Curated annotation (Swiss-Prot):
Full protein name: UDP-D-xylose:L-fucose alpha-1,3-D-xylosyltransferase 1
InterPro entries assigned: Nucl-diP-sugar_transferase, Nucleotide-diphossugar_trans, UDP-D-xylose:L-fucose_XylT
Post-translational modification: Glycosylated.
Required cofactor names: Mn(2+); Mg(2+)
Gene Ontology cellular-component terms listed: Golgi apparatus; Golgi membrane
Cell location: Golgi apparatus membrane
Domain notes: The conserved DXD motif is involved in enzyme activity.
Gene that encodes it: RGXT1
Organism: Arabidopsis thaliana (Mouse-ear cress)
Amino acid sequence: MEQKQHILKQSTFSSSPSSYSSISDRPISLLSRNGLLLLLLALVLLLGVLLPWPGSPLFLFPNRLSSSLSPSPQSKWRDYTLAQAARFVAKNGTVIVCAVSSPFLPFLNNWLISVSRQKHQDKVLVIAEDYITLYKVNEKWPGHAVLIPPALDSKTAFSFGSQGFFNFTARRPQHLLQILELGYNVMYNDVDMVWLQDPFLYLEGSHDAYFTDDMPQIKPLNHSHDLPHPDRNGETYICSCMIYLRPTNGAKLLMKKWSEELQSQAWSESIRFKANDQPAFNLALNKTAHQVDLYLLSQVAFPTGGLYFKNEAWVQETKGKHVIVHNNYIIGYDRKMKRFQDYGLWLVDDHALESPLGKLE
């Protein structure tokens, strides 16, 4: 009997430590497992906050993953490249481009309202010519502005016919060529334009380059879409304000030739020919006409300002057929704005919220 009790006690004590150890290990094991899961979950949430989603332009900065923690959130846009920006905004292989310096931000906003009404605003890429424009646009509309160095002086680029204005416009063919080399269709617009209809519906066929005539003389509604014959001075007057290009060898050749023509002539205050990029564009068109498939857009759909704002009878006769109106044939920032206001085309005052930029201060 005593032996049985001794064995029982021994058995009880010998099993107790292992049993106690087994039980005490369970909560520690469970706690470790749950803690690990919670740690992983917290890490995933933290990465979700710090890292942008793949479709965001911020995702395009692989070496700047901590940019959201940077004391200067604007600085990341200095590293934003044209290739990154084009990839971000392109829709159906197409980018809509404008080039803007900060004094013309109100005109950019006005143009954007009209583009938004045609549901094409997501394709827009603003090529900022100064850092004020780069930061302002990307603050309001992240990823839709890029600056291609060097930045220009906004004040000198403000006045039509100045050397600053010439330098501002002279970079245009280089920007467009870069986008073509990336494989995108590209539409260029000046921002002193207003869309009344969808211009993409009027890009008939599959030509290399589409453009508009800057002459105010009225053409027949069924006029030729070939490059007009030069006048007796050997000049054509195609506008460099609205151009559509496909990524073809012909379009690339045209941009290269345009750039060459600009580089071959220095700016001259006394010579109108050298005061902006349009004469060089016409030279390039005429020199490459036999190598590039060119298409002159309809005058009634894309009228120059010299016709639309100066021939009221024609405007009434062709009412409903206008697609993009260009506020040219007038010089001066305030005069352009007033003319838009007089014709009900200054949309910013009452419709700013229709722009992706909203109200600009």
